[in-house]
């Protein structure tokens, strides 16, 4: 089983798809990595040689930010926005959508489960 960037890649999948199991690598990035390392994308993960796995590891370490580093960078970007006190930072701080979606209805994913408010007495 190939282990790249701390992730065990699935054996029975094509390497082009298996690389997408690594956080930070999508289909396009996976194709670019395979072109750079001159490995055929239709090769199954278990058919890769140690040399090819080494080339993949080296290419990913050198040119792509993945897993922990990428997660850390994203969280630092969000923290920076919150420290600045800009609109997006305030929305992150309040746990609301920050890309202009409506919040009167919907937005339940960001706001969490609905808190019921007592109705008005007649």
Swiss-Prot record:
Region named Disordered: 97-122
Alphabetized GO MF terms: rRNA binding; structural constituent of ribosome; tRNA binding
Parts forming coiled coils: none
PROSITE patterns named among the record's database cross-references: RIBOSOMAL_S13_1, RIBOSOMAL_S13_2
A GO cellular component annotation in the UniProt record: small ribosomal subunit
Pfam families: Ribosomal_S13
Keywords: Ribonucleoprotein, Ribosomal protein, RNA-binding, rRNA-binding, tRNA-binding
GO annotation, biological process: translation
InterPro entries the UniProt entry points to: Rbsml_uS13_C, Ribosomal_uS13, Ribosomal_uS13-like_H2TH, Ribosomal_uS13_bac-type, Ribosomal_uS13_CS
Subunit structure of this chain's protein: Part of the 30S ribosomal subunit. Forms a loose heterodimer with protein S19. Forms two bridges to the 50S subunit in the 70S ribosome.
Function, in words: Located at the top of the head of the 30S subunit, it contacts several helices of the 16S rRNA. In the 70S ribosome it contacts the 23S rRNA (bridge B1a) and protein L5 of the 50S subunit (bridge B1b), connecting the 2 subunits; these bridges are implicated in subunit movement. Contacts the tRNAs in the A and P-sites.
PANTHER family xrefs: 30S RIBOSOMAL PROTEIN S13/40S RIBOSOMAL PROTEIN S18, SMALL RIBOSOMAL SUBUNIT PROTEIN US13M
Family according to the record: Belongs to the universal ribosomal protein uS13 family.
NCBIfam families reported for this sequence: uS13_bact
Name of this chain's protein: Small ribosomal subunit protein uS13
Organism annotation: Trichlorobacter lovleyi (strain ATCC BAA-1151 / DSM 17278 / SZ)
